[in-house]
């Protein structure tokens, strides 16, 4: 899914149609920020991460991309920057499509402020920060990100330690499995 062409055109116009993604370090920041979206429960593959990784490798090996490749990179890199900010700010799924009783209003969206944030991120080289500013700032959301990251690390390390089979352990019982259970 791509952001509407008008939105990208507005961003390119704000940048005076200058290429923004020639610097491999800037592209690396974008790729890293997109990969980190997994900690928000978003799938980095929805934001062209594989193609951007390939461009990052190619850009690191070449001094310049061909004009057509550079134009493709501009579109492919700007699109997820705008789209991910939108998803972080408002969510990826319209909640009323999942629950007809949904009665919360969405946060207001300012396209101009979004472009300003993207322009500032590109000018300062702080790609991750533009995602940080779009995320919900609630403490519970930040804790959720931390928990998701921790659980994914636990799963990558092999998951919870197993508990040997045996009878149900009830409060006050002594059992050789209790220390293993406590360690979990």
Where are each of the predicted segments found?
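Auxiliary tRNA-acceptor-end handling modules of aminoacyl-tRNA synthetases
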Residues: 1-184
């Amino acid at each position: 899914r791509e952001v509407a062409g008008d939105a990208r055109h507005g961003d390119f116009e704000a940048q005076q149609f200058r290429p923004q993604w020639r610097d491999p370090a800037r592209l690396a920041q974008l790729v890293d920020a997109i990969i980190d979206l997994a900690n928000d429960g978003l799938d980095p593959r929805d934001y062209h991460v594989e193609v951007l990784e390939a461009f990052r490798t190619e850009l690191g090996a070449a001094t310049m991309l061909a004009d057509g490749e550079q134009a493709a990179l501009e579109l492919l890199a700007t699109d997820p920057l705008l789209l991910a900010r939108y998803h972080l700010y408002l969510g990826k799924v319209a909640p009323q499509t999942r629950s007809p009783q949904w009665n919360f209003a969405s946060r207001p969206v300012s396209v101009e402020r979004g472009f300003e944030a993207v322009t500032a991120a590109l000018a300062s080289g702080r790609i991750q920060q533009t995602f940080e500013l779009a995320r919900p700032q609630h403490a519970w959301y930040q804790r959720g990100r931390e928990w998701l990251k921790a659980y994914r690390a636990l799963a990558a390390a092999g998951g919870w330690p197993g508990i040997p089979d045996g009878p149900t352990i009830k409060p006050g019982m002594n059992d050789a499995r209790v220390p293993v259970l406590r360690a979990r």
